[in-house]
């Protein structure tokens, strides 16, 4: 494949934007390949400015659960645009999407719309602290909750130590109120609560860790979180920005049967437009302004275009949708295992609904330490070869791949064949 136009575009972009991008992963640095500039998408396919076609498993990092340019979504967006892009006042569209979210997400009795997943998690932590009157938040190693200061925190030395900044610019004073423990480790969480329980406002977790390459919870982990937070009077917060409506019809909390106090949403609920949301029990949500004294606001929150795209996306999802995803996922997982075994290359495949992660190691992968044992050099080689075969994968080992309703069995079979061809070139 030729990337001449993309390479030329990147040279210009680098003079205009830091690293030439507006989000770091788009620079493709971890796979040592030129950034690809996209032109358009249709269904399960995406096309770059050089005219190359790819089967798309990135799907804008998850939001496009119906694939690109879904006709129903696009048609209603045209209607919404004709009425205006934003009004700074409420619209009926907000009621429609809010009701749909409340109907489908077990924990949500009231919801507040925002403009991004990061905004949703940031506001949720403020609400948790304001509601409980406590300061500290527990998060898990390898889970990503957006780029707000209090969540860009890595673990300190030892179990349940106070956090240290994970990026320059994050003050240590903020970091000290975030505790990081290993994912899928209830014993570590218990130690954290034994030390700091009286000042822990909440525990935030991706119910399926999608930002270390798709790592599901082990048996009993989520219920254990529910039990421990209840015991200490802390709030359990599910960050379902990625898992929301991808793991199941009632999100990950419905799939696993564990109900948090608060839930963060994003990605799928905007259908490709900028949106986020957070919600939970009425008694907690009513502490948000204007009913309560915990402040939150946003110029474009609940804007009519995002509400339209979100509603028209979610309204097309049914329980049968997830049966279709499971069928495609079964074929892809079986094919990956077969092809990698053929070439004597170890692989671990993790799945959760329409989210799939693969690690180039023996496995299992249940936490960040194990995810880090994947062969990153081989992953980068694999990425480059798969792009040549017309398959667009996330350019990072620590991002999940996604399925859409637009993907077909033929797409999956072509993808499996592409892996076989790629491995034939890599493994000598």
UniProtKB/Swiss-Prot annotation:
**Pfam family name, one:** Aminotran_3
Metal-binding in keyword set: no
Asked whether the keyword Heme is assigned, the reply is: no
What InterPro entries does its record include?
4pyrrol_synth_GluAld_NH2Trfase (IPR004639), Aminotrans_3 (IPR005814), Aminotrans_3_PPA_site (IPR049704), PyrdxlP-dep_Trfase (IPR015424), PyrdxlP-dep_Trfase_major (IPR015421), PyrdxlP-dep_Trfase_small (IPR015422)
Please list every transmembrane segment annotated in the UniProt record, as residue ranges.
none
This enzyme catalyses: (S)-4-amino-5-oxopentanoate = 5-aminolevulinate
CDD domains this protein is in?
OAT_like
The UniProt GO MF terms for this protein read: glutamate-1-semialdehyde 2,1-aminomutase activity; pyridoxal phosphate binding; transaminase activity
Oligomeric form and interacting partners: Homodimer.
> Could you tell me what this protein is called?
Glutamate-1-semialdehyde 2,1-aminomutase 1
Origin species, per record, is Staphylococcus aureus (strain MSSA476)
What's the gene? hemL1
